[in-house]
Amino acid sequence: MRPIKVLIVEDSIVFRELLVQNLRRDPAVQVVGTARDPFEARDAILAYKPDVMTLDVELPRMNGIEFLRKLMPQYPLPVVVISSLSDKVFDAMNAGAVDFVAKPALSNRSQLEDFIRNELLVKIKIASTAKISNIKKKTVLAAEQQHLTSRKKELVVAIGASTGGTEATSAVVRGFGADIPGIVCVQHMPPGFTQMYAKRLNDESRLQVKEAETGDRVLPGHMLIAPGGDRHMRLVKVGTGYQVEVKPGARVNG
């Protein structure tokens, strides 16, 4: 099997070189090129035809979100966004990125190397298997599910999503009415991002959406999103309904 061809788009020379050095240590990955801004990236895409592109959001000459909006209709490819803790990452997902990782501080080299090997590399390998047309199709189909309504208060809707799933989840939730049974959602995200994602969905939909906390009740018209990181959300039966319990735990399936 040939290695995954990766293009790195990053304006920080220090972080860019760290990405190159650490990704090249894995024989399953071939870094075919780097770019400092979207204009260099455009030329590199045409020259190297990468399987996956990593993309910083904050770039000179054109930001990463605008670049994605221009790129994806003409040259769709799996893109993993590397972003600081900002809700701009969801705009990037909406523009066509398949996944994202939280950009660590540049002050600790060993932590940076661990991040690249244990988080970014995993995302790149998963992204290389993504079918962009399928992801977009699923998002469109999900947006058509607009007629699910409440039948019994004890019903619970469960949503789980990973790579490429944030925009599909958003499309589903925007189609729900306020009489939908209570929703619990597990969305694969780094710590810190789930709270921003919940606020975004709360503003965009007819539901009351929040990041879950222990003791929160699962109520019709409400949606609870499990916190990112190493915490797990568990449903607990209380009378005729449910509430959630959030506690630390080992990762399940990565």
Where are these regions (language model features)?
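Conserved acid/base catalytic micro-environments in cytosolic active-site loops
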Residues: R2-L7, I13-A28, T34-T54, E58-G254
